[in-house]
Design a protein with these regions (language model features):
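Short, intrinsically disordered low-complexity segments
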Residues: 36-133
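Structured loops at beta-to-helix junctions and adjacent beta-edge loops in soluble globular domains
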Residues: 18, 75-77, 208
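Short aromatic/hydrophobic-glycine micro-motifs
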Residues: 31-34, 109, 186, 193
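Short, extreme N-terminal segment that most often corresponds to the first beta-strand
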Residues: 1-33, 214-219
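Residues that form generic nucleotide/phosphate-binding pockets
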Residues: 28, 102, 106, 183
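Long, compositionally biased intrinsically disordered terminal regions
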Residues: 73, 121, 128-219
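Intrinsically disordered, low-complexity regions enriched in Ser/Pro/Gly/Gln/His and often acidic
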Residues: 7, 63, 114-117, 163, ...
Length: 219
């Protein structure tokens, strides 16, 4: 991993794509204008967008070098919610699931994750070989979707948990996002300076950015 690697991951959404090729990811996700960027440059840009005018957090994503066999794509564009609300930084979980399905058709496995403690917003959507095998999204302590077979880490959390509501519905949190992500692929914050990265990272524009006509911004 490059010496400039930065691993403070908080309040963020991301994709994990098995052995994903950057150019193909850009194509499949309808991204554009990829420019080479280091970890520091890419992540700083994505995080800075969050504090800019409404919708900026949806404008760019950072495609990381290949780490432990996975290519991560980080940015608010992958936040799975109940419906599209782009200026508020949200997209329908159905659209995120469709993107995971598409990516897994090409690369074998793809997952989407949201870890937002302050917003009580957590999700994991897992796909293999062109099929979404698990969807779990909770927002403001409301479970929006709970379909498919739970991952082993999730099943254990459910068995050990006392966080069921009055209706007996389990409500996952950020710890579960971490554990499911780690089981399925890699959890970004558990990478470190000794983690070997392969290839380059890229900062790319989302369809939302192009629609608004925001000029290309360099890292």
């Amino acid at each position: 991993m490059a010496k400039d690697a930065w691993f403070q991951f908080e309040d963020i959404s991301w994709l994990a794509v098995k052995k994903g090729d950057p150019a193909r990811i850009v194509e499949l996700l309808s991204l554009s204008g990829p420019v080479e960027a280091s970890w520091n440059e890419g992540l700083s840009a994505v995080y800075d967008d969050y504090f800019n005018p409404k919708g900026d957090q949806m404008s760019r994503v950072y495609i990381t070098p290949l780490v432990q066999g996975w290519r991560l794509v980080l940015g608010g564009w992958f936040g799975a919610s109940s419906e599209d609300h782009l200026e508020g930084g949200q997209r329908s979980y159905r659209k995120i699931a469709a993107e995971c399905r598409k990516l897994s058709t090409v690369f074998g496995q793809a997952g989407a994750f949201t870890l937002q403690w302050r917003m009580v917003w957590f999700s994991w959507i897992l796909a293999r070989e062109g099929k979404v095998v698990r969807q779990y999204v909770v927002e403001d302590e409301e479970v929006l979707v709970d379909s498919g077979r739970p991952a082993a880490a999730e099943a254990k959390a459910r068995a050990d948990s006392e966080s069921e509501d009055e209706d007996g519905e389990w409500c996952g949190d950020g710890v579960d996002v971490v554990n499911v992500a780690q089981e399925f692929s890699v959890f970004p914050e558990r990478l470190g300076a000794k983690t070997k990265g392969v290839g380059k990272g890229f900062l790319a524009l989302t369809p939302w950015d192009r629609k608004r006509g925001v000029p290309v911004r360099r890292p």
